[in-house]
Swiss-Prot record:
Residue intervals passing through the bilayer: 23-43, 55-75, 100-120
Protein localization: Cell membrane
Gene Ontology CC entries for this record: plasma membrane
Family: Belongs to the CPA3 antiporters (TC 2.A.63) subunit E family.
Molecular function via GO: antiporter activity; monoatomic cation transmembrane transporter activity
Chief localization: membrane
Key words, A-Z: Antiport, Cell membrane, Ion transport, Membrane, Transmembrane, Transmembrane helix, Transport
Xref: InterPro entries: Cation_antiport_E
Protein's UniProt name: Putative antiporter subunit mnhE2
Bilayer topology: Multi-pass membrane protein
Organism: Staphylococcus epidermidis (strain ATCC 35984 / DSM 28319 / BCRC 17069 / CCUG 31568 / BM 3577 / RP62A)
Subunit structure: May form a heterooligomeric complex that consists of seven subunits: mnhA2, mnhB2, mnhC2, mnhD2, mnhE2, mnhF2 and mnhG2.
Length: 160
């Protein structure tokens, strides 16, 4: 957060020194880019990672989630319309390595929002998720656990 504020301050200072008459967005943008370069060079002294890395991870996270949402929606629609007799609902467990409550809650929300699965319970001691899935055949079970692991890895990457 400090890096973002500092970058905006550098951009405004750049505008003040360059454009004395009026505010120009192009000058602000140039100052913002100069601020990015300065902060990238000095980010080791902040004791934090360069802030654009987290923004990139958030964009990557959004892309992965949208892909998972679309594919699981298509799969669920396929089960509802064409494979009603082949549905094999059931429970499965997933143990997470997430420690903070908000990260576990966020993972729970991602699982619930994704069609075809919902979290029934979370064990307090072991952080084990009990998940109901529309199909627990080996292939679909592996796909669901793989997507949950992918969500978990991205949450860990964002929170580092």
């Amino acid at each position: 957060m400090k890096q973002v504020v500092l970058n905006i301050v550098i951009a405004f200072l750049w505008v003040l020194f360059q454009d004395e008459d009026e505010f120009k967005f192009t000058t602000f943008f140039a100052g913002f880019l100069i601020g990015l370069i300065v902060i990238y060079i000095l980010h080791r002294f902040f004791g934090e990672e360069f802030y654009l890395k987290k923004i990139w991870v958030a964009i990557k996270f959004l892309a992965v989630y949208l892909y998972q949402l679309i594919t699981s929606s298509i799969s669920t629609i396929n089960y509802i319309l064409f494979k009603t007799n082949e549905v094999n609902p059931g429970l499965l467990t997933y143990e997470t390595s997430l420690k903070s409550n908000w990260a576990i809650t966020f993972l729970t929300i991602l699982i619930i929002i994704t069609p075809g699965s919902t979290v029934i319970r979370i064990s307090k001691n072991t952080n084990k998720f009990f998940i109901h899935s529309i199909d627990v055949s080996e292939k679909d079970k592996e796909n669901l656990l793989k997507s949950i692991k992918q969500y978990e890895d991205l949450i860990l990457e964002v929170t580092r």
